[in-house]
UniProtKB/Swiss-Prot annotation:
This is Zinc finger protein NUTCRACKER. Residues 1-29 are annotated as: Disordered. Inhibition of transcription factor activity by KIN10-mediated phosphorylation at Thr-98, Ser-178 and Ser-182 under sugar deprivation conditions, thus delaying flowering. The modification Phosphothreonine is found at T98. InterPro entries: C2CH-3rd_BIRD-IDD, C2CH-4th_BIRD-IDD, C2H2-2nd_BIRD-IDD, IDD1-16, Znf_C2H2_sf, Znf_C2H2_type. The gene is NUC. The keyword DNA-binding applies. It comes from the Eukaryota. Transcription activator that binds to the DNA sequence 5'-CTTTTGTCC-3'. Regulates photoperiodic flowering by modulating sugar transport and metabolism. Regulates SUS1 and SUS4. Transcription factor that regulates tissue boundaries and asymmetric cell division. Contributes to the sequestration of 'SHORT-ROOT' to the nucleus. Interacts with AKIN10.
C-alpha cells in the first residue's frame, strides 16, 4: 500500500500541484488593479473648478456653528446636530454618500491684507483656514510653561509642550531652538547677516583711513606720481600777490620751446599768468612756500647761487624764450651776445616818433609784453620782461628778502646776468654818449646801424619786432 501512495504522489493524479507565488500575485493584480492615490494640491493653489467660500471672522472662529432650535446646544458639524435632533423626535436627515462626485470647496481668509484673501490663493479645507486665521491674525492664548513661548492654536501648543526642553539647538547669536528645521533656517539668515555686516564695517574702515590720510589708504601720492614729470622746486619766500586768481595758476603745462621771441616762429601761445615781481624767480611755486623768512634766508641764498652757476639751459637766447622745462635744452645751444641781440632787433625795422622812452632806464625792460607769433591772439596779461629770465618750473629762487649784494654776486656767475646788465645800462650809456658825458662827446661811433636809441627803446617799436 505504501508503494501505491508513492506512485500516486509521483504521478500527480491524487493531488494538485501547488502554483508559484509569483503567478498568484500576477493574477491578483489583473483582477484588482491598485487604486491610484490622488495627489493633494499644495496650499494656496486651489482647483480652478472649486467653489470659493468666504466666511466672516465671527462665523469662521465660532466653536459651535450648528445650534439646536429646541435646547440651543451648539455643534461643530452638521452631522452631529442631526443626530441630536433625533433625540428630540424632530425630523432629521443624514448626508448620504452618492456615486456623484461632490464639488470641492475652498475657503478664503477674511483678512483683506492677507495673501490668502484672493480666490487664487484660497485654502482647501475649513480646518486649515481656521488655523491659518488664528496663527496669522488671531490672539495667542496658550503659553508654554518652560520657555514662555505663546501659541494661537491649541494643537501647536500641545505639540511644542511635548518636545520643549528635550532637544536644544543654540545659535552663535544666543537664540535657542527646539526644532532643527527652525534652527537651520535661522542659522542661514544669521550667517548672511554677519557677512554683510563685516563687508560694511570693512568699507567704513577704508573710508575712514582715506579721509584721515593714513598710510595704506586709497589716497594716491601725488608727489610720487608726478615726480617724473615736474622737476622739484627750490624753496623760496613768496611775496604778496595782487591777482586774486594766482592760486589757480600754480601748475601750467609746458609749452613748446623756441630760441627766442625774435627768432622762433613756432612758439605756442603762452598761458595767462600773473605779474612777476622779481627779476629772478617764479610766482607760481606756491606749493614750496616757506613763511619764515628769517629761518630759511641763508639756505635759499645758497640754493640760488648753486642753481644759477650750474644751470645750463639759461643761455642768452633763453632771455626771450617761452616757458619750458629744464631738460628741454635742444634749442638753447645757440649763444648770442647782448650786442648781437640789439643788432638783430634793429634789423627788423621798427620806427618810432617819440623819445619819451629814453627818460626812464627801466622803460626798456618794461616794454616787453609776451606775445604769440600767431597774430590772431594776443596775451597781454602784464607779464613784463622780468618773467623771461628762466623757465617756470626751475627758477623759483629769488625774493625781495634777499640781500642785494648776494643777488649781485649770483648774477655775475652766469651769462644771463651780464646780458641783463648790458641791456639795462645801454640806454644810459647811449644818453651819456649823446650828451657828451664821461665817455666823450661824439668822438666814437656807438650807433652801429644809425637807427637811434629811440627806435630801440620805444614800446611800439618793440611790439613791431614781435
Amino acid at each position: 500500500m505504501t508503494s501505491e501512495v508513492l506512485q500516486t504522489i509521483s504521478s500527480g493524479s491524487g493531488f494538485a500541484q501547488p502554483q508559484s507565488s509569483s503567478t498568484l500575485d500576477h493574477d491578483e493584480s489583473l483582477i484588482n488593479p491598485p487604486l491610484v492615490k490622488k495627489k493633494r494640491n499644495l496650499p494656496g493653489n486651489p482647483d480652478p473648478e472649486a467653489e470659493v467660500i468666504a466666511l466672516s471672522p465671527t462665523t469662521l472662529m465660532a466653536t459651535n456653528r450648528f445650534l439646536c432650535e429646541v435646547c440651543g446646544k451648539g455643534f461643530q458639524r452638521d452631522q452631529n446636530l442631526q443626530l441630536h435632533r433625533r433625540g428630540h423626535n424632530l425630523p432629521w436627515k443624514l448626508k448620504q454618500r452618492t456615486s456623484k462626485e461632490v464639488r470641492k470647496r475652498v475657503y478664503v481668509c477674511p483678512e483683506k491684507t492677507c495673501v490668502h484673501h484672493h480666490s487664487s490663493r484660497a485654502l482647501g479645507d475649513l480646518t486649515g483656514i481656521k488655523k491659518h486665521f488664528c496663527r496669522k491674525h488671531g490672539e495667542k492664548k496658550w503659553t508654554c510653561e518652560k520657555c514662555a513661548k505663546r501659541y494661537a492654536v491649541q494643537s501647536d501648543w500641545k505639540a511644542h509642550s511635548k518636545t520643549c526642553g528635550t532637544r536644544e539647538y543654540r545659535c552663535d547669536c544666543g537664540t535657542i531652538f527646539s526644532r532643527r528645521d527652525s534652527f537651520i533656517t535661522h542659522r542661514a539668515f544669521c550667517d548672511a547677516l554677519a557677512e554683510e555686516t563685516a563687508k560694511i564695517n570693512a568699507v567704513s574702515h577704508l573710508n575712514g583711513l582715506a579721509a584721515a590720510g593714513a598710510p595704506g589708504s586709497v589716497n594716491l601720492n601725488y608727489q610720487y606720481l608726478m615726480g617724473t614729470f615736474i622737476p622739484p622746486l627750490q624753496p623760496f619766500v613768496p611775496q604778496p600777490q595782487t591777482n586774486p586768481n594766482h592760486h589757480h595758476q600754480h601748475f601750467q603745462p609746458p609749452t613748446s620751446s623756441s630760441l627766442s621771441l625774435w627768432m622762433g616762429q613756432d612758439i605756442a601761445p603762452p598761458q595767462p599768468q600773473p605779474d612777476y615781481d622779481w627779476v629772478f624767480g617764479n610766482a607760481k611755486a606756491a606749493s614750496a612756500c616757506i613763511d619764515n623768512n628769517n629761518t630759511h634766508d641763508e639756505q635759499i641764498t645758497q640754493n640760488a647761487n648753486a642753481s644759477l652757476t650750474t644751470t645750463t639751459t639759461l643761455s642768452a637766447p633763453s632771455l626771450f624764450s617761452s616757458d619750458q622745462p629744464q631738460n628741454a635744452n635742444a634749442n638753447s645751444n645757440v649763444n648770442m651776445s647782448a650786442t648781437a641781440l640789439l643788432q638783430k632787433a634793429a634789423e627788423i625795422g621798427a620806427t618810432s616818433t617819440t623819445t619819451a622812452a629814453t627818460n626812464d632806464p627801466s622803460t626798456f625792460l618794461q616794454s616787453f609784453p609776451l606775445k604769440s607769433t600767431d597774430q590772431t591772439t594776443s596775451y597781454d596779461s602784464g607779464e613784463k620782461f622780468f618773467a623771461l629770465f628762466g623757465s617756470n618750473n626751475n627758477i623759483g629762487l629769488m625774493s625781495r628778502s634777499h640781500d642785494h649784494q648776494e643777488i649781485e654776486n649770483a648774477r655775475n656767475d652766469v651769462t644771463v646776468a651780464s646780458a641783463l646788465d648790458e641791456l639795462q645800462n645801454y640806454p644810459w650809456k647811449r644818453r651819456r654818449v649823446d650828451g657828451g658825458g664821461e665817455v666823450g662827446g661824439g668822438g666814437q661811433t656807438r650807433d652801429f646801424l644809425g637807427v637811434g636809441v629811440q627806435t630801440l627803446c620805444h614800446p611800439s617799436s618793440i611790439n613791431g619786432w614781435i
